[in-house]
Design a protein with these regions (language model features):
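Core active-site phosphate/anionic-ligand binding loop and the adjoining beta-turn-alpha structural block
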Residues: 1
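Glycine- and aromatic-enriched mobile tails/lids
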Residues: 10, 22-256
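Short loop/turn motifs at secondary-structure junctions and domain boundaries
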Residues: 5-9
Length: 256
């Protein structure tokens, strides 16, 4: 069982990326192999969805494919109009280093132990995230079982955690790294919970079970599910995407 996201390495979950030009249907291809829906951003390994159990061999192979496509993207001058101003850099520096400021301002408010009224530490947020995902999103403590009501409650608690993570504090650069790891993990967990709620079936028995939809439902859910998150509101929109079996039965027979 993995922390934060149960069965994460085997659920095919991850970013939606373009497939290779030679075999991808139109819905799976938009210009460059392994490029995400954000132009110029490429992914590989566990970052990318659509394939389970990549392990190190699959991940570094996919990394090589993504790197070659990124180089091609640059060589074809697709990135020539990308401009980054000093003002943008300063803005992001303030965002990145904010946990250090939160700690510096709030540390003198602690009267005992490690609990501050104005910030939470990365370890405190991490423990909350683990508890939410374990108890509400089908972790080992509940025998990998969840349901619609539990998932909705989990999303409510994850929303509260996201609010508190605006005030995460870091006493040094190592804790700053931990703070940003926590922010990214919390967002990933939120996304997985939204998808688990949206998919009303049990697609991967053994990794999680929807107690209110225990059976596999190919009639309604033989598909991919994709989401978009509004960066301003934090709200997700969900939709289904078709699954194309690019390698058909005849090819499988030949391969075996």
């Amino acid at each position: 069982s993995e922390p934060y996201v149960m069965g994460s390495h085997a659920t095919c979950s991850g970013a939606w990326v373009s497939g290779p030009e030679d075999i991808s249907p139109p819905e799976y291809y938009w210009g460059y192999n392994r490029m995400m829906t954000v132009q110029g951003l490429f992914g590989a390994g566990d970052t990318v969805g659509g394939s389970a159990h990549k392990f190190s061999s699959g991940s570094f192979t996919e990394g090589r494919l993504a790197a070659k496509a990124a180089v091609k993207y640059i060589e074809e001058q697709k990135a020539k109009n990308i401009k980054v101003s000093d003002e943008q850099c300063e803005k992001f520096k303030k965002i990145i280093y904010k946990p250090l400021e939160n700690y510096t301002v709030g540390r003198n408010e602690i009267t005992g132990g490690t609990v501050s009224p104005s910030y939470i530490s990365p370890i405190q947020g991490l423990q909350r995230l683990q508890k939410i995902m374990d108890e509400y999103v089908g972790g080992i403590s509940v025998n990998y079982m969840t349901n619609g009501n539990l998932l909705k409650k989990g999303l409510e608690l994850l929303d509260w955690l996201q609010e508190d993570l605006e005030n995460v504090g870091a006493e040094d650069y190592h804790q700053l790294m931990r703070a940003w790891e926590l922010k990214h993990r919390a967002l990933t967990s939120q996304c997985v919970t939204e998808h688990t709620l949206f998919r009303e079936e049990t697609r991967w028995p053994g990794y999680y079970y929807r107690g209110d939809h225990l059976k596999l439902d190919d009639e309604n859910w033989h598909c991919l599910t994709v989401s978009r998150r509004d960066p301003k509101t934090g709200k997700f929109t969900m939709e289904k995407m078709p699954v194309y079996h690019i390698i058909g039965d005849e090819e499988k027979k030949k391969a075996s």
